[in-house]
């Protein structure tokens, strides 16, 4: 490993091997512990996209609130469908929800809000690129989740995991924003492993990962956007040797997007001071 890989592996907390039952139990217990430590929490809120990460996080959250209720705590899991108009993979969203069995499902079409925001910016002389409009969608989705959480005395659960965190492959204050991130510490293949253990439908964890935020590049695979495969990222996170080209790509993403992993800097926390 390179010196930087040593640092990253330690920071991202990915184990070389996991026991599915133990790892699931630890994540469920973390969610329960957080709720038990905050008396105001009566709901957990999460947007469900039909992809691996939200399906796994949603299932574990639902299992956690069911245990909490059995222990006498009033708490529910709210799954949120957040389409931008008509969602191309809407059937997979429904399949994920059928697997999760959330206590409540709320649907909010973000298209009117996003389109109006883009229009207002354009009228002010700010013409967003397609990529920037994609970030608008991600931030609107998170805004909606926090609004629901506020209304229902809840918190927002994030789907950030270590294979995503290392590359910064999320929108700052969009899908990167949340109160807790239960599946951090897992890489992509470990997330699939847990979904298999939880008996998720195979097509949900074998689905090609995509953020699907850009209108000009619908369903763009994550790996194409990143220039590196998840297997390579996972190997890197497990401390394995990978090609120098893949290593450089991953480390460039890590360094470039360091700001996404930090809260707003102050003059006391900025390392250059």
From Swiss-Prot:
GO cellular component, as recorded: cytoplasm
HAMAP family membership: NadE_ammonia_dep
Give the residues the record marks as binding ATP: 47-54, 159, 188, 210
Q: Name one Pfam family in it.
A: NAD_synthase
The GO molecular function terms of this record are: ATP binding; glutaminase activity; metal ion binding; NAD+ synthase (glutamine-hydrolyzing) activity; NAD+ synthase activity
Q: Where is the signal peptide?
A: none
Q: What is the lineage of its organism?
A: Bacteria, Bacillati, Bacillota, Bacilli, Bacillales
Matching InterPro entries: NAD/GMP_synthase, NAD_synthase, NH(3)-dep_NAD(+)_synth, Rossmann-like_a/b/a_fold
Spell out the family assignment given in the record's similarity comment. Answer: Belongs to the NAD synthetase family.
Q: Which reaction does it catalyse?
A: deamido-NAD(+) + NH4(+) + ATP = AMP + diphosphate + NAD(+) + H(+)
Cite the CDD domains for this sequence. Answer: NAD_synthase
Q: Which organism is it from?
A: Staphylococcus haemolyticus (strain JCSC1435)
Q: What is this protein called?
A: NH(3)-dependent NAD(+) synthetase
